[in-house]
Amino acid sequence: MASEFKKKLFWRAVVAEFLAMILFIFISIGSALGFHYPIKSNQTTGAVQDNVKVSLAFGLSIATLAQSVGHISGAHLNPAVTLGLLLSCQISILRAIMYIIAQCVGAIVATVILSGITSSLPDNSLGLNALAPGVNSGQGLGIEIIGTLQLVLCVLATTDRRRRRDLGDSGPLAIGFSVALGHLLAIDYTGCGINPARSFGSSVITHNFQDHWIFWVGPFIGAALAVLIYDFILAPRSSDLTDRVKVWTSGQVEEYDLDADDINSRVEMKPK
């Protein structure tokens, strides 16, 4: 673990997660807040939000950023995805911790920027996730679990090294579609979290943590279930416990060169 900590590529990856998260939150949440602005001078604010447009903004931004920084950090951009890859023994514990910190800080920074740009909006929630009227905490939790499960399942399948020849370069696009699909499912029920860092940034800046636990517990349960389903039922991995522990402590041996800053030894969100 200490060996990975000393490498420049490790810190480049952490910075990549931080910067990409800022862009992701700014683009995606900004697209949702934009519906409150009038397009013409005779229109009033408070237009009906177009769920399809917002879902596509979230999905396409993930697909674009996965292509942009996937070769540097893997472009997780989501603590639930990071947890899933950790439980799947594809990244080290240290990398997972630093990624989640970078993602959360990046989300906060992006939300602060959005807060300044959209300060004239009345009742600006900054994309705060909340349960819709009539949706209880159990139902909201279930929606978040299912939405995240399908996302992490897609990530595990598209980043499976055994499938690289089959997938080509379509991995980021598939993951982007999965994010959009999750929003089409969940946006009317919970505002669609499926990303604890995205939910955390809005809650911190608005000082509103009502039902916030749902947007951490749900995605983490969904991620764990996705790993259980993919790694132990659909596509079992042959690596033994010793190899898995080595990954947790030292990183993915096949993907990371821990003894030299080899520019080619990176894990990618897209197949190589």
UniProtKB/Swiss-Prot annotation:
In this protein, the residues bearing a glycan are N42
Q: What are the GO BP annotations of this UniProt entry? A: ammonium transmembrane transport; carbon dioxide transmembrane transport; carbon dioxide transport; cell volume homeostasis; cellular homeostasis; cellular hyperosmotic response; cellular response to cAMP; cellular response to copper ion
- The entry's keywords: Cell membrane, Glycoprotein, Membrane, Phosphoprotein, Repeat, Transmembrane, Transmembrane helix, Transport
User: Which spans of this chain does the record mark as coiled coil?
Assistant: none
The family database entries (Gene3D superfamilies) matched by this protein are listed as: Glycerol uptake facilitator protein
This entry carries the following GO cellular component terms, namely:
ankyrin-1 complex; apical plasma membrane; basal plasma membrane; basolateral plasma membrane; brush border; brush border membrane; cytoplasm; nuclear membrane
User: Which tissues does the record link to its expression?
Assistant: Detected in fetal kidney (at protein level). Detected in fetal kidney.
Residues with PTM Phosphoserine: S250, S265
Q: Does the keyword Nucleotide-binding apply?
A: no
Q: What is known of its domains?
A: Aquaporins contain two tandem repeats each containing three membrane-spanning domains and a pore-forming loop with the signature motif Asn-Pro-Ala (NPA).
Q: Which NCBIfam families match?
A: MIP (TIGR00861)
The protein in question is named Aquaporin-1
Q: Which gene encodes it?
A: AQP1
